[in-house]
Design a protein with these regions (language model features):
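Accessory terminal helices/loops
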Residues: 173-249
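Active-site-proximal segments of metal-dependent phosphoesterases and phosphodiesterases across multiple
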Residues: 154-166
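Active-site neighborhood of phospho(di)ester-bond hydrolases with catalytic His/Asp-centered motifs
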Residues: 16-19, 38-48, 59-63, 130-133, ...
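Residue-level signal for the nucleotide or nucleotide-sugar donor/cofactor binding architecture
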Residues: 51, 126, 167
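Conserved beta-strand hairpin/beta-sheet module of binuclear metal-dependent hydrolase folds
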Residues: 1-32, 140-156
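Active-site HxH/HxHxD metal-binding segment of metal-dependent hydrolases
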Residues: 23-114, 118, 207-216, 220
Length: 249
């Protein structure tokens, strides 16, 4: 579950969009990159996006995700029983560690983000979009000037997921219908490489035709074990945006 972690540099403070699984200290890594205050934003509350959120003093997200973030994540979120191994952990160095022991530290939000909010970094600004369906409080960050959307798991270049315990397929269909009609040139998803508008339309249309859905989460999880490392990790889009690979930290 290699979540994309985006570090966006600003004039007075930096943004961190999602925080990965929390297998090692993300904050330690970030402090080597910047001395500015960090506003950590979680696009939604799933374990692979909020694992290191607790390390940061400023934790922002949608109020509909708050209840989950306040608790140690349970097996509904981490798919206990489906995931036995964490590939990034060296079994020889840490023989006692297993996926079944994995937990996420509670990280209560210190502030809320919702539709219409704007985060101004000085050099650029992001409009918050509420994109429910994958989860109740999924959000995206849209730069209207550059026409880039950081979409979390509302849209990524892979099989889409709408059947978790708190997913809502009907809302998800509305979200995807909305996204496909937005004026966006580049999509930075919660997983996999970034992509353009034509690919976004293809992904969404395939979803609506039933060809691009994860129908059984645990089966998909087991099938995904042992997949090769993401060759697209550590992407740099410009001087102010860096994609941090989970394999680095």
């Amino acid at each position: 579950m290699r979540c994309n972690i985006w570090h966006i540099k600003g004039q007075e403070f930096d943004l961190l969009i999602d925080t990965g699984m929390g297998l090692s200290s993300l904050k330690k890594y970030i402090l080597e990159e910047t001395s500015k205050p960090i506003k950590a934003i979680v696009t939604h509350s799933h374990f692979d996006h909020c694992g290191s959120l607790h390390e940061f003093n400023c934790r922002l997200g949608h109020k509909n995700e708050e209840e989950i973030l306040e608790k140690t994540l349970n097996d509904k979120i981490v798919f206990s029983g489906a995931w036995k191994e964490i590939e990034i952990i060296d079994k020889k160095q840490f023989p006692e560690y297993s996926g079944e022991k994995y937990t996420v530290t509670p990280a209560p939000l210190t502030g809320y983000l919702d539709e219409g909010d704007v985060i101004d970094l000085g050099s650029r600004a992001f409009n918050i979009l509420h994109l429910p369906g994958h989860s109740p409080g999924s959000i995206g960050l849209l730069d209207l000037k550059s026409k880039e959307l950081f979409s979390g798991d509302a849209l990524y270049d892979g099989e889409l997921l709408d059947n978790l315990y708190h997913s809502d397929p009907k809302l998800y269909e509305k979200t995807l219908s909305r996204i496909i009609n937005l004026d966006i040139n580049i999509f930075h998803g919660g997983h996999f490489p970034s992509f353009g508008k034509n690919r976004a339309k293809e992904i969404i249309n395939n979803y609506f035709s039933g060809q691009n859905k994860i129908k059984d989460v645990k089966l998909w999880f087991n099938k995904s074990k042992g997949m090769s490392k993401d060759i697209f990790s550590d992407q740099n889009w410009d001087s102010s945006i860096k994609l941090i690979s989970q394999n680095e930290i």
